[in-house]
């Protein structure tokens, strides 16, 4: 359920982009009416309207996630705060400058921040981030936890690079498809691979 919650802003970004892409004149009019005061020149063209409207939607959706968690008295993950900061800063630049290049960097920066936090935690603070998250559910040798931690670092680094490659070498519509389906699909494949790896190394329960 949490993974669906985490992917909700991406799904809404995808939905708004695809709808606006199919109704560009309507999207341009709406974006000019609602965002004209925020954009350079005051007018949004049909070509740029879909990504600008989708950017507004993803900012609002990410903020709504945090407000919903706060209203229910739940802890807001640090990465969700980071995501809100990134999407607000890069999204605002995208809207003002009429340039999708800024928002295209958001997934990459977020992937690299997550990877860097795991790497710094392991090398500098001697704290394994993945073990902290999963250690209560399974018992593994420290050497295995390190391998798992570094594999996530490598995965996040690779995903950040892959996002940039798709974003700046293919049409924006292709990047939007990759952002939802490619990102989710690769994450699922990686998690399944991790599950098989962990299953081989789980220590047997000898307490019974």
Curated annotation (Swiss-Prot):
Pfam families in alphabetical order: IspA
Domain of life: Bacteria
Localization in the cell: Cell inner membrane
Topology relative to the membrane: Multi-pass membrane protein
Gene Ontology cellular-component terms listed: plasma membrane
InterPro entries according to UniProt: YciB
Keywords: Cell inner membrane, Cell membrane, Membrane, Transmembrane, Transmembrane helix
Ranges annotated as spanning the membrane: 49-69, 78-98, 105-125, 150-170, 178-198
Chief site of localization: membrane
Keyword Cell inner membrane: yes
Summary of the function given for this chain in its UniProt record: Plays a role in cell envelope biogenesis, maintenance of cell envelope integrity and membrane homeostasis.
UniProt similarity note: Belongs to the YciB family.
HAMAP family in the cross-refs: YciB
NCBIfam families (UniProt xref): PRK00259.1-3
Name of the protein in its database record: Inner membrane-spanning protein YciB
Gene it is expressed from: yciB
